[in-house]
């Protein structure tokens, strides 16, 4: 890449962007349309520019660019400041929208490398007909076409289609792009040999009824739910339309674990149609910190599903992930050969995990060989969610024996002293009332875990972001359980059951599955006694610290 050209082209884009806003015109696809006219103006007359625009295939593209011919002279002035060489370089080599996206979270080159990963997993070759459903602004199909692959793009957003056609014009690459809804019957019957579904990370920006009317989904109507993620239905449609029946779908983690999609996951796993799952790190895709997930659909995968954890295989700085070509090659090799961070998970093992396909369920850094599930030794309840208006009515200005515990009240593994007082606690909330030596654990990551110390007269009500764990003391010492959950191994065990793309959390159902290593009760009790001794020492240190701080405050 030419750094000098990039800097100048970036300055040019900011000027064009401000020009578009000042005119009250649409930024997308206006940025591409205005830039196209500006660059052409350096070499062609206004009349010639109109002729070139007429060569575009789509009426919508021609119309969108023609708007800016009215500003030919003004755009020519902008372009002349930077020169044809710089601007043509930018149009051929840079993604305009990404370059101007000041909120970007990742490396702009990640798009191309992610496309290369998908194409590499497809093993595209000469003679393939490749189609991308939800082609967006065309990065994927243009990348495929540049490798000599016949490429089709489909997107429901006409702005995306216009930008894709303009990009292909400047890169001198032949592609076909359609503005249609892949969910509808009779669309996209191209006879592709390889296809990708990348229809965005939104759950509900589509018509569920239209999707379910598709003829290819009729056998699956009973297991595809409206509350689920559409990628499963669309992947099936694409799979049925393919000549070879191989599809790669890009989605987000909820598709692998949410209860709404359990039925379709179970059906596809048992039919041998899910070949593999690859989880990539948060921040891989520009503009979102959501973790991308690759789902590979093909036939006759009766041995199980390849599941790969690639979340820590890329370089990450803060929220920015940088992908390098060698890393892409390594991921493809690991997946194809099912080695290192990729393993074949049997159908029976997936069934035992309730058809959750998240990688953290199947990769254990410190596997607990002899363990017992929390559900077998504990009573676990979620705290209560009380509306703010109702909670205000419950709060007491005067001290009472009733108090309320929130997430922020757990600091350094202890409950703070000054909890809000309540007038009383309705018995309908009894399951959320904490008892002495109960364990409290937060629902959200990072986990806050503490042991409750309370006399019999007081009652503390836990809120909805917390779980109450009451350990059967005949089976395990609650202090041992608490210490294990806080430990590195315990945190890794909890992490296996964490779900969520942005808000990482554990459900009560999954918390009950967390395993605790077995230990002789005598050893547990010894550990608990040592813990109590350490806590007494810490309390003395805290008191001394308070005295010292008080003395410091009196120095003046």
Where are these regions (language model features)?
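DNA target-recognition patches
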Residues: 205-213, 391-426
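Conserved Class I SAM-dependent methyltransferase catalytic core
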Residues: 225-290, 294-296
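A short beta-sheet element
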Residues: 429-432, 436-486
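A short glycine-rich beta-alpha junction/loop motif
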Residues: 295, 360, 459-467, 498-526, ...
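Non-catalytic DNA-recognition/assembly elements of restriction-modification systems
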Residues: 336-399, 411-414, 518-556
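Flexible, glycine-/basic-rich loop-and-beta segments that form/coincide
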Residues: 287-370
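Conserved S-adenosyl-L-methionine
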Residues: 104-204, 252-253, 264, 270
């Amino acid at each position: 890449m030419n750094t000098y050209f990039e800097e100048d082209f970036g300055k040019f884009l900011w000027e064009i962007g401000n020009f578009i806003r000042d005119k009250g015109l649409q930024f997308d696809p206006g940025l591409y349309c205005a830039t196209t006219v500006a660059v052409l103006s350096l070499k062609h007359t206004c009349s010639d520019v109109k002729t070139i625009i007429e060569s575009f295939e789509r009426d919508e593209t021609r119309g969108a660019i023609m708007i800016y011919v009215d500003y030919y002279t003004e755009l020519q002035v902008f372009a002349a400041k930077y020169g044809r060489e710089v601007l043509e370089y930018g149009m051929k080599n840079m993604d305009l929208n990404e370059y101007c996206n000041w909120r970007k979270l990742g490396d702009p080159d990640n798009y191309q490398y992610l496309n290369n990963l998908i194409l590499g997993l497809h093993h595209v070759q000469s003679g393939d007909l490749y189609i991308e459903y939800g082609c967006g602004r065309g990065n994927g199909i243009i990348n495929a076409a540049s490798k000599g692959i016949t490429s089709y793009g489909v997107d429901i957003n006409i702005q995306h289609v216009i930008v894709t056609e303009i990009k292909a014009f400047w890169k001198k690459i032949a592609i076909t792009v359609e503005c249609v809804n892949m969910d509808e019957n009779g669309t996209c019957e191209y006879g592709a040999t390889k296809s990708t579904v990348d229809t965005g990370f939104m759950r509900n920006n589509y018509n569920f009824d239209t999707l379910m009317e598709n003829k290819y989904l009729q056998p699956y109507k009973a297991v595809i739910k409206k509350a689920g993620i559409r990628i499963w239905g669309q992947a099936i449609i694409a799979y049925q339309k393919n000549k070879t029946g191989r599809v790669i779908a890009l989605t987000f983690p909820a598709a692998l674990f949410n209860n709404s999609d359990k039925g379709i996951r179970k059906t596809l796993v048992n039919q041998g149609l899910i070949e593999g799952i690859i989880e990539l790190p948060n921040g891989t895709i520009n503009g979102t910190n959501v973790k991308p997930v690759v789902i590979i659909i093909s036939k006759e995968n009766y041995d199980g599903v390849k599941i790969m954890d690639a979340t820590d295989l890329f370089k990450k700085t803060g929220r920015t992930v940088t992908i390098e070509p060698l890393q892409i090659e390594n991921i493809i090799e690991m997946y194809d050969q099912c080695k290192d961070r990729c393993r074949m998970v049997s159908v029976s093992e997936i069934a035992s995990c309730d058809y959750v396909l998240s990688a953290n369920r199947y990769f254990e850094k410190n596997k607990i060989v002899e363990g017992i599930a929390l559900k077998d030794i504990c009573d676990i309840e979620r705290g209560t969610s009380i509306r703010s208006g109702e909670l205000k009515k419950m709060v007491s200005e005067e001290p009472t024996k009733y108090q309320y515990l929130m997430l922020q009240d757990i600091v350094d593994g202890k409950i703070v002293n000054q909890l809000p007082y309540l007038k009383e606690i309705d018995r309908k909330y009894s399951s959320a009332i904490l008892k002495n030596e109960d364990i409290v654990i937060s629902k959200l990551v990072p986990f806050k875990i503490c042991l409750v110390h309370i006399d019999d007269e007081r009652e503390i009500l836990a809120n909805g972001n917390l779980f109450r764990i009451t350990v059967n003391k005949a089976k395990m010492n609650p202090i041992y359980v608490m210490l294990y959950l806080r430990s590195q191994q315990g945190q890794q065990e909890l992490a296996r059951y964490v779900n969520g793309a942005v808000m990482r959390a554990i459900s009560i159902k999954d918390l009950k599955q967390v395993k605790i290593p077995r230990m002789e009760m005598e050893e547990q009790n010894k550990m608990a006694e040592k813990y109590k001794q350490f806590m007494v020492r810490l309390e003395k240190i805290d008191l001394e610290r308070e005295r010292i701080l008080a003395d410091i405050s009196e120095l003046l």
